[in-house]
């Protein structure tokens, strides 16, 4: 987010109203300790994460007729949740990404057009943001009552899905397509909070850590 051409609304970290608590980084008082575009090999996303992003109709890729498959490079990014292109580098990304060993590279928290080796990348890092509050609420409601109403989904998870250009998560969508509501709530948490340090502890909380970490790790097709 650098200029009027790429950011006509002038949005940036100084106008961010979503972060409730956050760590501030800038070139003078607190430079970043790593280069996001160069050294995040340990955060390289696998195809499993990529496949977790739903299509614009709100359905997982194995359920959605909108999924374009893997025939050509970039096909899998079409008709998908906007967060996929925001978080993962695409073949036409404006920021050149060189880290990664699975064919995918992390794009989240990078700056538009930057590709530096001098740590000149200064996005603030969230400690607590509004999206996490929404996700905590939806998960807590479902875990407590074994169900969640569409109204409760609309004031939590669907605020995130709407921003990402994805159809709302509803009880009807789940029932009509043979989905599981808890799985979809957890999916939303996983994709929204990618690279924010939650996944490992979430898997432990859900009793899924051993199962998930022992699966094969695949890269780009």
Locations of the language-model features?
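Acidic/polar-rich alpha-helix caps and helix-coil junctions
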Residues: 1-34, 65-221
């Amino acid at each position: 987010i650098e200029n009027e051409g790429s950011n006509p609304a002038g949005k940036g970290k100084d106008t961010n109203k979503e972060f409730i608590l956050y760590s501030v980084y800038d070139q003078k008082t607190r430079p970043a300790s790593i280069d996001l575009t160069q050294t995040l090999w340990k955060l390289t996303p696998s195809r499993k994460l990529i496949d977790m992003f739903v299509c614009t109709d709100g359905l997982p890729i194995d359920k959605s007729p909108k999924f374009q498959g893997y025939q050509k490079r970039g096909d899998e990014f079409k008709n998908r949740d906007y967060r996929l292109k925001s978080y993962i580098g695409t073949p036409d990304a404006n920021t050149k990404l060189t880290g990664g060993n699975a064919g995918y590279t992390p794009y989240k928290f990078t700056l538009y057009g930057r590709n530096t080796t001098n740590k000149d990348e200064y996005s603030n890092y969230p400690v607590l943001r509004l999206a996490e509050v929404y996700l905590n609420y939806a998960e807590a409601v479902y875990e407590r009552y074994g169900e969640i109403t569409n109204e409760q989904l609309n004031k939590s998870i669907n605020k995130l899905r709407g921003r990402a250009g994805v159809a709302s998560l509803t009880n009807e969508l789940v029932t009509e397509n043979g989905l599981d509501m808890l799985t979809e709530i957890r999916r939303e948490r996983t994709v929204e909070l990618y690279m924010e340090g939650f996944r490992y502890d979430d898997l432990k909380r859900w009793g899924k850590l051993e199962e998930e970490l022992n699966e094969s790790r695949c890269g780009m097709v």
